[in-house]
UniProtKB/Swiss-Prot annotation:
It holds the Pfam family Actin. This is Actin-related protein T2. Gene3D superfamilies: 3.30.420.40, Actin, Chain A, domain 4. SMART domains: ACTIN. Belongs to the actin family. InterPro entries: Actin, Actin/actin-like_CS, ATPase_NBD. It is found in: Cytoplasm, Cytoskeleton. Keywords: Cytoplasm, Cytoskeleton. GO terms for cellular component: cytoplasm; cytoskeleton. Its main location: cytoplasm.
Length: 377
């Protein structure tokens, strides 16, 4: 039975990403809990295992026990592909991270641009039928990131762990015909950096696992303004030091700018899609001529993979060459952009006017899962 008073409670927010899921409550400044989007299942069930033995592990606990587990990523390239594991991850967030009963509070979940219809309806079914939420809403990650910058019209460049996309938004609505996606993002840059480091001739005193290379990437990688010039600089000009977990210090050079270069030149990963600057230009030129100038003047970066030092300057430089002469271009790079989407969700669910937006359990019962197609856009 739908309880209308549940809409007065702070909403639960799940920002579902390929690499991280961020969970928290409406009205707060940031997510309370951030977990890796990983579910691990035991490779072998001990014969003496009792009924209480855990069958699966989520997030960091799964990564910690990875030797004994088979790891699964329920979100691939931004899209949910493993629904059973996704449900386990959400259950973990509700019960163990937030400590809330799903039936007590409304839930806003984020979704990627161009999320397929079947995925949207499946999520509504899982939330209403399996978790018993009183109300639910699905919101575009790029639109929420734009809200976090106090804008309703602009172009969002969103790059996380699994996918990079450019999303034009007009008065709070994304323009799907002009969305551009690239399957090169954080995890691809980490893999490329690993290959480059191994090929560089360095000897590493400890294993180059994903966690270590991720840390090197986040602390030292950068985007060069002029990549050819950067590679011709003297080694001592580009070398940066990194302290390994065993205390040894190594000096790293060219790979630090070569790996993020894949965002601007995906061809180096065998991907024939255009790079970031051309994606932005292409998305904007697919929009109505009347709003193209506005979009060039309000480009907002979102997602952890846009945090590379120099990325905004390089994007601006290349867009100035691609845009028509005298087009004003402004790129906003919020410092907290790795969770901009979550902040936007916290803002919109705090508005009193949002109460009428919720798809309630009664709506779901009356109209079925297709109700999200009409109500969440």
């Amino acid at each position: 039975m739908f309880n209308p008073h549940a809409l007065d409670s702070p909403a639960v927010i799940f920002d579902n990403g390929s690499g991280l899921c961020k969970a928290g409550l409406s009205g707060e400044f940031g997510p309370r809990h951030i977990v890796s989007s990983i579910v691990g299942h035991l490779k072998f069930q001990a014969p003496s295992a009792g009924a209480n033995q855990k069958k699966y592990f989520v997030g960091e606990e799964a990564l910690y026990k990875l030797e004994a587990l088979q790891l699964h990523s329920p979100i691939e390239r931004g899209l949910i592909t493993g629904w059973d594991d996704m449900e386990r991850l959400w259950k973990h967030l509700f019960e163990w991270e937030l400590g809330v009963k799903p039936s007590d509070q409304p839930l806003l979940a984020t979704e990627p641009s161009l999320n397929p219809r079947e995925n949207r309806e499946k999520m509504a079914e899982v939330m209403f039928e399996n978790f018993g939420v009183p109300a639910f809403y699905l919101s575009d990650q790029a639109v929420l990131a734009l809200y976090a910058s106090a804008c309703v019209t602009g172009l969002v460049v969103d790059s996380g762990d699994g996918v990079t996309c450019t999303v034009p938004i007009f008065e709070g609505y994304s323009l799907p015909h002009a969305v551009t996606k690239l399957h090169v993002a954080g995890r691809d840059i980490t893999e490329l950096l690993t290959q480059l480091l191994l090929a560089s001739g360095h000897t590493f005193s400890c294993e180059l696992d994903k966690g270590l290379v991720d840390d090197i990437k986040k602390k030292l990688c950068y985007v060069a303004l002029e990549p050819e010039k950067e590679l011709s600089r003297r080694p001592e000009e580009v070398l940066r030091e990194y302290k390994l977990p065993d205390g040894n210090i190594i000096s790293l050079g060219d790979p630090l700018c070569q790996a993020p270069e894949a965002l601007f030149a995906p061809q180096q990963l065998g991907c024939q899609s255009p790079g970031l600057s051309h994606m932005v230009s292409s998305s904007i030129t697919k929009c109505d001529a009347d709003i193209q100038k506005i979009l060039f003047g309000e480009i907002v970066l979102s997602g952890g993979t846009t945090l590379f030092h120099g990325l905004d300057d390089r994007l601006l430089k290349e867009l100035e060459q691609l845009a028509s002469k005298d087009t004003p271009i402004k790129i906003t790079a919020p410092p907290d952009r790795w969770f901009s989407t979550w902040i936007g969700a916290s803002i919109v669910t705090s508005l009193s006017s949002f109460k009428q937006m919720w798809v309630t359990a009664a709506d779901f019962k009356e109209f079925g899962s297709s109700v999200v197609q009409r109500r969440c856009f």
